[in-house]
């Protein structure tokens, strides 16, 4: 069966037709100014036109009318350096991954440009309110609690909601990571999709056979939210080896959106981690890059363990920063008053999460799930997953700061 044309295909065809028309116009008109002005808008007009085949109703062809990016469906085996969609630093998906368009790792962009700088504190306060930290400060606390109730998953939802029969969450997250990295999707997509899965499972019973469908549709929803040129529902059906049909993927998408009440933009670990990393950045670019790679590696590892659901995303981000700094400089205290001010946390506030992240890094938990570790063993990521960390953290590093010098 021929694949339906998408708008991206139509845009390419329209561009080629416009170029041919321009050449003919130039041949017949030496000045060519008027002809060029007329055909300049042709690609956009043709691409956006309503008469494109299969670009109509979603009920007949899900996603056929949306701009789509169909990665190679052969399997998630992309090597760093392989061709992929270009990701410009500072775009919606964050810094691009190594290998996207062949480029190197890009430092976390400045999240507080001149236009944003006056509002940095307000933005930070709003993000923390969304994660549930400052609900009591809301003017209408009752309404706020009702609206934000579903943004935080239940800590022990496996026992309380699922009856203990879902013990495959770690494997599901590991598989989702393989897809996101293998098909060069935005890194934000993984964090959002995992949060959708946890929130959905906190209040909806899902049997084990449909768990992969939930993860697949969560990736579909997150890719729509993050990426204008997202893969189609057909693509997400195919990556399950057609275990689930396109209609099943779309139906589960509708269930997720209905449950979330279309509140899809909750802050995740990477949201806060990028802000912390930029604010803590020094003048040595290679050191900055290595620290960022280490912290982002730890942040992805944190998704594997359901124990970390109990922590707010900003706490997990702060703990990843602590463990990342400790790993790269084990003899230097990772926390100081400046970092404490930037993150808003004392060491005692994040100690439990620090130990959890450190256990994951050391392989004391979930060492059998290799997707994330293998990804960061690559030279493109400076092999940060192979950098050893001391087995224990010095007790003095886990004490709260009392003086400027610790």
Swiss-Prot record:
<dbReference type="Pfam" id="PF00134">
    <property type="entry name" value="Cyclin_N"/>
</dbReference>
<dbReference type="InterPro" id="IPR013763">
    <property type="entry name" value="Cyclin-like_dom"/>
</dbReference>
<keyword id="KW-0131">Cell cycle</keyword>
<dbReference type="InterPro" id="IPR036915">
    <property type="entry name" value="Cyclin-like_sf"/>
</dbReference>
<protein>
    <recommendedName>
        <fullName>Putative cyclin-F3-2</fullName>
    </recommendedName>
</protein>
<feature type="compositionally biased region" description="Low complexity">
    <location>
        <begin position="29"/>
        <end position="57"/>
    </location>
</feature>
<dbReference type="InterPro" id="IPR006671">
    <property type="entry name" value="Cyclin_N"/>
</dbReference>
<dbReference type="InterPro" id="IPR046965">
    <property type="entry name" value="Cyclin_A/B-like"/>
</dbReference>
<dbReference type="InterPro" id="IPR039361">
    <property type="entry name" value="Cyclin"/>
</dbReference>
<dbReference type="InterPro" id="IPR048258">
    <property type="entry name" value="Cyclins_cyclin-box"/>
</dbReference>
<dbReference type="GO" id="GO:0000307">
    <property type="term" value="C:cyclin-dependent protein kinase holoenzyme complex"/>
</dbReference>
<keyword id="KW-0195">Cyclin</keyword>
<dbReference type="GO" id="GO:0016538">
    <property type="term" value="F:cyclin-dependent protein serine/threonine kinase regulator activity"/>
</dbReference>
<comment type="similarity">
    <text>Belongs to the cyclin family. Cyclin F subfamily.</text>
</comment>
<dbReference type="Pfam" id="PF02984">
    <property type="entry name" value="Cyclin_C"/>
</dbReference>
<dbReference type="GO" id="GO:0005634">
    <property type="term" value="C:nucleus"/>
</dbReference>
<dbReference type="GO" id="GO:0005737">
    <property type="term" value="C:cytoplasm"/>
</dbReference>
<dbReference type="GO" id="GO:0000082">
    <property type="term" value="P:G1/S transition of mitotic cell cycle"/>
</dbReference>
<feature type="region of interest" description="Disordered">
    <location>
        <begin position="1"/>
        <end position="107"/>
    </location>
</feature>
<feature type="compositionally biased region" description="Low complexity">
    <location>
        <begin position="11"/>
        <end position="21"/>
    </location>
</feature>
<keyword id="KW-0132">Cell division</keyword>
<dbReference type="GO" id="GO:0051301">
    <property type="term" value="P:cell division"/>
</dbReference>
<dbReference type="InterPro" id="IPR004367">
    <property type="entry name" value="Cyclin_C-dom"/>
</dbReference>
